[in-house]
Every structure is written in structure tokens, then in C-alpha cells.
């Protein structure tokens, strides 16, 4: 017997504002940890001070050129992470080396809070600075709900869904969207707009989606859809 014939089809879960609970979206060790003072100091530096410190350590770098790079705003690649290695060369030169960029980076669940009074931490920072402005530039007349699509890391993906609900003050669909799902809870209608299926087998239009889909996303996410996708393929 085929397993898909036994298990019920996956469906989107509706997340309401006010449902965020920190213990669901951080590892206990990180949630109870205190961030290192040096790291916290760096994260609170102004852009100008960061540029000055970097140019002091790298005299050949021009401050204006670095400022221009930091001012650049991508059209499509709005959210990224990087894997870094602290390396030392044969001549004893130490530096950080970027070995990979990620379009759906993880790490929020491992990052201690920089401010104990802001319990949503980096989740809210990302949503307020990136996703909210992205959604507010919506296409004229496009109706529908918001969604978080994921195929990994439910601890963080659900955290983003809960924070989006709080920031945008509306319900958000939290949607599993796996590469090998024979009956996925996501489809596109005749107008090329995304729809998601809830637990009652009802389909809902989506005007914008936060992508946490990493395994061959091009197999499932249409390039030419009316739904705005945060970090499209």
C-alpha cells in the first residue's frame, strides 16, 4: 500500500496574532543565554562606525565605496545569510572567509536576545525591516491572505509566521510545502495567483508569501505568479 494513500493530505494552519511563544522558537539553551557583550556591542554599532572600524583594519578600502555597497538594495534577493570560517593562512594572517550564501538562512533559534524586553528578537527585526515593506508594495487590486511556506526548520518557520501575524495584524497561513508531496496544499489558479488549502479542504488566495522552501524550490514555486514571494526563485 502506498503511504500517501494512508496519510491525510497536508494542510495549511492558520496562525492568529498574539500566538507567539518564545519557547517554541528558540532552543532552551539559547533562550536562557546572555549574549556576549562584544557581540551585542557590534550589533548596536551605527553604519558609520562599522565603516570606520573596517577601514581602520583594512586601510586600502575606501569608505565611500563601502558605504555605496551597504546602501545597495536588491530587487529580488532581500534576505540572505552566510556561513563564515575564521581561518589563518600559512603566513599567520587571520581573516573571516565566506564559504556559502543562503537564501533561506536559519539561526534565529540559536541566537540569544540582544534585548531581554524584546522577546521576538531577530524574528521581528527581519519582518519589520524586510517583509513588511515588501508586502506594502503590493500589486494594485491583489486580494488574499499572507502565508509562510516551508519545507524545513519548523521551529523557525512557525516563529516567522507568528511574528508576521503580530506585525501585520492579520491571520497568516503556515503551510508545509515539500518536494515529494503528491497532494501539496499549494496550487495556482487560472490567474496565476497562489492558493493554499486549509484543514477544512478550503482554498484561500494568497497575496504575498514568505518563502522558507529550500529543497528544489523551482519545482513548486512559479516564476510568473501574481502572488508576491519574499525571496523568489
Which residues are covered by each model-predicted region?
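Preference for protein termini
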Residues: 1-233
